[in-house]
Amino acid sequence: MDKLAFGVGAVDFQARINYDRLRTERLAKTQAALKEAGLAAAILTRTENIRYTTALRGPFFAPQLRYALVFAEHDPIMYELGDILEGQKVHATWIKPQNWRYAYCWLNGIPGAAAVQEEARRFAQAIVRDLKEHGVYGERIGTDGIDEAGRAALAEAGVQLTSAMPAMLQARSIKTVDEVNCLRLAIAISNR
């Protein structure tokens, strides 16, 4: 393998990792995999899938605090936790301003059964609203792991879920030039 000819900093005089292209190609690969799997959209809750499709990092301390609705033929919608939403909007300018939403979460049942059911109902209503707005309500929708409260609320709202994990694994299986260069850079740093 050739030596890595660039470092971690960004410069205007060398072709290095192109992060705009990285984000664009990752989303395109995901959308192609969703289409191939016959999915109109996917509700993604797993950190690695949100990161892959939106390039967003966030809190990792509890499941389903945030989620992304990634469409096969439209731009993704990001549902973000509380005040984190405002900070993400400032820095993640590649997500369209109209595609940010506040997330609904129920913290694995900590608030109690009635609160969980109500929050899951609001979650499902928000998802259904966006599915209808994009013309895919009633089509096959994938997920990479929504808990029972979320699944039940979506089913009650008429959303039938199937696994999006095969499509996500397919999308991530073949690396782009920028993904390979990210891996090479990480290896170069760790081999010092």
Predicted regions span which residues?
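N-terminal glycine-rich flavin-associated loop
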Residues: 192
